[in-house]
Amino acid sequence: MNRRAFFKRLFSGIFVAKAFPLLGKEKKVPYSLTTHKVASNSWKEQNLIGRVVIAKDLNIPSLEAELRSKRVKEMILEGVKELLAAPSIPAAWKSLFSPSDFVGIKLSCLAGRQLSPHPEVVDGIVAGLRLAGVKDENILIWERTNRELIGAGFTINTSKKGVKCFGSDALELPYDATLQFAGSVGSCFSTILSTYCTALINVPVLKDHDLAGVTLAMKNLFGVIHNPNRYHDNNCDPYIAELSTHPYIKDKQRLILCDGLLAQCHGGPSYKQQWAWNFSGLIISQDAVAADAIGADIIEKKRKELNLKPLKEEGRAPKYIATAAGLGLGENRLDKIKLIKI
């Protein structure tokens, strides 16, 4: 039996059911997710390789909560408009999403409340989706576990009313029964991505990673598979890049919005206050490779400012970014990336 056949048998439906026994018992979603197919790939006409927007406002940290939320929402809506060079904010969002879409907003909440996507950032994304005609009931804020979402300050909503918010572990079947391959990565995908979502919005945080160098858009997608810990050797290269070649990601990921309101240049992926700073910005793109390249450059510059060694000298250069570019997933050369600052 070859390796691929072995793993397919190993991760059969029976194995998956036995591998996640507690998840079924701790089920919090009182219904099964409906299967939705991607109706159209017309949005790919807007897919702008090598184009990145940085929306930044240094006044963000000093604003009161209501004004801060309003300003962050403006940055998101205007940032997507500038990214797509659209004639208006509604036109920009309508070019990416339609009322028939079921949208998963994949967060990165491993580091807890201090260094996870801010609720006001997610609120701004939801506002954009509403402009595109997406119903609240068709929007799902999502992470690996309910615990991570709660720890980051989000409220779980498993009802059929309003914007949903829950982890893969809240489902009776959190991961597919069938093993999928993407290069050397063999994993079962979250059913939220494989079954429910027709569109994916990737919301990482601007921070470093002790093994991969940085954990940004592409690394955040380790949270959509059941066995990410298997793929951390060699600075997670080529695994991070290869995972993004899978159709579930390649065909559904429509927007990357990296939360850099608070960023971290050392000690990640967990929160380390001494290495965090107010970048006060958002990185917005459709090109995950370009977004990661820009994010890594920001982190390297901050490290230099603080007299920290370059990531390469610490043995954790984010090699996966160049690998992803080599796979045709996007642009990693900084001098070729069209960077728009607003």
Where are these regions (language model features)?
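N-terminal and secondary-structure boundary signal
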Residues: 1-342
